[in-house]
């Protein structure tokens, strides 16, 4: 059995997440589970019924808190992948936790850790040795400066520049 991916609770963001997953070329099938999406293979309350046919699932909610909550529920049955667009750059020493979604042309630098269910937007840069918490949404063009910490559930505006030192002066 190959890898099959469910995109759960996707609302508007699901189409983009599907394109990111397709760019990776590692899923033989990608489907949606959502109460409001035309073409979804099922409703949210039925998500468990697709296991073991589908072995991977990821939440694609716009809201980081909701995304994190859904991924926590899903991990009881499914593998929660890290999705990264083929046009993103991720350092080999970076650590991306389950449920991360990295959009095109984003960069994750050396020694950085990206928390669970965090979205790194297109053209965003997480520089060296940063810690980005769980459930964050770094919108397009966000820059997280070297050795910064981004608190859990942070949501930025496009083009934001963040610096909160990991070390005390």
Regions found by a protein language model. Give the residues of each.
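Structural signal for interior beta-strand "rungs" in well-ordered beta-sheet cores
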Residues: 82-169
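Terminal amphipathic alpha-helical/low-complexity segments used for targeting or macromolecular assembly
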Residues: 1-86
